[in-house]
Regions:
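An N-terminal amphipathic alpha-helical segment
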Residues: 1-57
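Short, compact, well-ordered microdomains
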Residues: 61-97
């Protein structure tokens, strides 16, 4: 028997799990910036992983869109002066302290 409500619930759970992965990747970006700033650097690169072992698979393009939105927010609030994206998956950050 077809149970559309169950399918919808599973899809929502999948999207929620994927968003958690996006948040983990964004936290890694922030950690990378903080570590490099502590080392006295004013720039860093971050390679967005196309997959993470032991994590749910996620749509890579959706992840990049999520990260772009979050990065735009920190650009407004923090001292990030330059953000560049290099295809297929590399972010370049430069900041002014």
């Amino acid at each position: 028997m077809l149970n559309l409500s169950l399918i919808k619930i599973k899809q929502e759970q999948l999207k929620y799990s994927q968003k958690l992965v996006y948040k983990k990747i964004f936290a890694q970006i922030c950690q990378t910036i903080n570590i490099n700033a502590d080392l006295g650097k004013n720039y860093c690169l971050f390679v967005v992983p196309e997959f993470i072992l032991d994590e749910i698979t996620y749509p890579f393009i959706d992840c990049l869109e999520y990260l772009n939105k979050k990065i735009e927010k920190i650009k407004k609030d923090k001292n990030i002066v330059e953000v560049s994206f290099f295809v297929p998956n590399v972010f370049y950050f430069k900041w002014d302290i």
